[in-house]
Structures are given as structure tokens and as C-alpha cells.
Curated annotation (Swiss-Prot):
Single Gene Ontology MF annotation: ATP binding
InterPro entries: PurM-like_C_dom (IPR010918), PurM-like_C_sf (IPR036676), PurM-like_N (IPR016188), PurM-like_N_sf (IPR036921), PurM_cligase (IPR004733)
Pathway: Purine metabolism; IMP biosynthesis via de novo pathway; 5-amino-1-(5-phospho-D-ribosyl)imidazole from N(2)-formyl-N(1)-(5-phospho-D-ribosyl)glycinamide: step 2/2
Protein name as it appears in the record: Phosphoribosylformylglycinamidine cyclo-ligase
Subcellular location: Cytoplasm
GO CC field: cytosol
Gene this chain is encoded by: purM
Keywords: ATP-binding, Cytoplasm, Ligase, Nucleotide-binding, Purine biosynthesis
Amino acid sequence: MTDKTSLSYKDAGVDIDAGNALVDRIKGVVKQTKRPEVMGGLGGFGALCALPQKYREPILVSGTDGVGTKLRLAMDLKRHDTIGIDLVAMCVNDLVVQGAEPLFFLDYYATGKLDVDTAAAVITGIAEGCKQSGCALVGGETAEMPGMYHGEDYDVAGFCVGVVEKADIIDGSKVQAGDTLLALAASGPHSNGYSLVRKILSFSQTDPEQTQVEGKSLADHLLAPTCIYVKALLSLIAQTEVHAIAHLTGGGFWENIPRVLPAGTQAVIDKNSWQWPAVFRWLQQAGNVSRHEMYRTFNCGVGMVIAVPADSTAKALAILADLGETAWVLGQIHPADGEHQVIIR
């Protein structure tokens, strides 16, 4: 071999300088998320975090998630500023349903070719989600992998750790017949069902930017960031008895509510207790989707389902209203009368 060409990592498609520029861009917003328990800053091999001193028997709760194919829609529409909020929401909402306070968050951002502006927008959204949920963004990984992703396409994943007092873990074991089921309103489809969303858009030949649904573009409805319920739910838990909380994600009503129901109980939901938001009505009509499939794929406007003792219903609704949440009585827990743990009627 006689060619004396000297190859570099950049020639292979990995731009270390771009990665360093990204770190410089995000330092400020990441710093805004710091909690007093966090030791050190960005740049270490690992992040250090002490447990809050208020806990007597602290139990760590962890979770990891992504945003699914909502990312594809965001990339197609070149809207990257709220995807990071979605990522945090999917993780921290899974923690808080067990009564846990999120402590810290880490992200993974992978792409074929690093676009600093896009990555900075995504990570700024992650920092915003961390601020909304009160957890610290303590680190992450930015992986530029030419040949693994097409061009500047990217994927994100998140990992979160929280803490709960052992005696205060919410696991559904206290749920009993007669409990009231409350709903917390969703901002839209959140981060689930987007493969079906994209199929409906293709099937109906719809341009989401040009299609108006109740005064705003369909794109705005579909890319609305996932609600982060952490502060509202922690406040509710601190003020009244809560028996269970279900985060309506993939699998919708049929699969998520049973995860917090003990044997011998059944959730009976009143379908007339709320009207589906316009975006779900549009999706159902445009895709000719059955109601059963809608309930299985989407949250249909319900982000969280909360089981409380019947005599705590009014108090819980008042607390949630004071916190600015839209909440209502969704149904009730009944003794199980068959194989189905969720009945919508």
C-alpha cells in the first residue's frame, strides 16, 4: 500500500469538535436542573448523588423509556424543541405512580451525523422536563454513529432514578371495591400510538401542518409535549390517601389499569364522564379506527387514572383543581365479576 493519506475520526464521520460544541451549548440549561443532593457537574465518568436526608427508609425506584415513533413525526416536521420533554415525562411519570420523587435523569442521544442545533434543541427540552419534574439532569451520552442511522436522523432514550419512603410505596395493594377512579387530563396522545398516527396520516393523505383541528394545526395537536404530572401527584399523595395510580401509556386502558389492580377487583369506567379531545376524534374518523382499538392504543384524553377511597373523592378533586389540573370522576372499583379487569360502558 503506497497511499500516504492520513485518515482521521472526522473522515470516518465522527466529529469530536461538534460533540464538544454541543456540550458547551447545553451546559447552562443543564446547570439549571441541579438538586442539592447532586455532587459535581458535567464531565465526570459518573454522576454522584446523595439520598435526601428526609427519608428514613429510602427505596430507589428506576425507569427507562423512549419516545417511540413520535420522533419520526418530529423529524419530518423539523420540530425538535419538545421531544425532550416527552422523553423525561415518559420516565418520571412511571416513577411518580409508585409514589416516588424523581432524583436524577440521564439521556442517550444517537444519530448518524450530529447536528448541534437539533441536538441542543432536544437536550434543552430534556432540561425543561427535568425542571418541571424537579429532577437533576446529571449526564448523558451523545453517540454519532455513521452507517447506523440515516443522515441526521436520531433516537433518544432516558433513564431516571427516584426515591420513595418504604412505608409510602403505592403499589395498588390497597385498592378495594368502592374506590373512586379519577382521571387527569392528557395534553394529547402524549408519546404512544404514533405508528398508528403516522399510518392514519399516510392512509388519509393528510398534511398535519395544513390541517386544522379546532383552531390549531393537527401538527400542534400531535406534537404537544407529554404532560408531566410529578409535582401535582406528589402534592396529592402528601395531602390525601391514594390507593393506586396508573399511567396510560402503550396498551392504553386495557393494559395499564390492570397493572395496579389486585385480584378480585375490576375497574368500571363511565365512557360518558368525558369527551375525547378533538385530536382523538379526528384520528378515529380519519383512520376508521374502532373504539376498542382506540382505547387499546391511545389515552383518549386521560393521562393518569387515580384510585382513591370514596370518601376522599371531593378532597382529591379540590386539591387537583387548586394545582391547575383538569380532573374528574372517571369510574369506580367493583368486585370482579368475570375475566375482564377493565370495563368501559
